[in-house]
Amino acid sequence: MLSAQLNDYLAEVGLTATEQQKKQLVDFVGMLNKWNKAFNLTSVRDPEQMLIRHIMDSLVVSPHLKGSRFIDVGTGPGLPGIPLAILNPDKEFVLLDSLGKRIRFQKQVQFELGINNISSIESRVEAYQPEELFDGVLSRAFASIQDMLHWCHHLPKADGCFYALKGQLSEDEMAQLPAGFVVTDIFELKVPKLDEQRHLLRVIKQD
């Protein structure tokens, strides 16, 4: 059932995936549903809704990623990082979260599904000092873009960028970007079976 729905959704948004990747994505939903009952990893309880609100909501970002090394800040159970890592085995993803139960879940997912391009790290973002900086800093966890840029400013390379996943856009929020940051792109994301607005903002730091 989920496999057939995933096929339809991928076709609808123009994304391609191998049979192995599709199996990993469906199995990830299964693990998230199973662990969620004990560890409360997400407020979404229904696997079909997980496929839409977590898997597809993450995957539609994929065509807009530039570079090979990314960090997903405040990733929770691995969103959007794990679906993006499955679809992009040539890219490296660091998944950062401050809660141990979420990191344990992510590591179990990596082990059971054989995902080799993820590193899960338990840390608060302000305390995390990577040895190598990132092409892209991703997050759907922050309440505002200002918060994201404030807490994550030290993570991208000089030519790297921030990818903020947002719902409805607020003109006030856009007008209050910290000095030295510029929104270069606003992408309207279409998620199958989801009526709510979804946007991806690409932000760069200017000298």
UniProtKB/Swiss-Prot annotation:
GO cellular component, one term: cytosol
Keyword DNA damage: no
Localization per record: Cytoplasm
Primary site of residence: cytoplasm
Catalytic activity: guanosine(527) in 16S rRNA + S-adenosyl-L-methionine = N(7)-methylguanosine(527) in 16S rRNA + S-adenosyl-L-homocysteine
Keyword rRNA processing on entry: yes
GO molecular function, one term: rRNA (guanine-N7-)-methyltransferase activity
Pfam families: GidB
Binding locations of S-adenosyl-L-methionine: 74, 79, 125-126, 140
CDD domains for the chain: AdoMet_MTases (cd02440)
Superkingdom per UniProt: Bacteria
Keywords (A to Z) from UniProt: Cytoplasm, Methyltransferase, rRNA processing, S-adenosyl-L-methionine, Transferase
UniProt feature coiled coil, ranges: none
Transmembrane segments: none
Family under the similarity heading: Belongs to the methyltransferase superfamily. RNA methyltransferase RsmG family.
PANTHER family in the record: S-ADENOSYL-L-METHIONINE-DEPENDENT METHYLTRANSFERASES SUPERFAMILY PROTEIN (PTHR31760:SF0)
NCBIfam families linked: rsmG_gidB
Function: Specifically methylates the N7 position of guanine in position 527 of 16S rRNA.
Protein name: Ribosomal RNA small subunit methyltransferase G
Source organism of the structure: Shewanella halifaxensis (strain HAW-EB4)
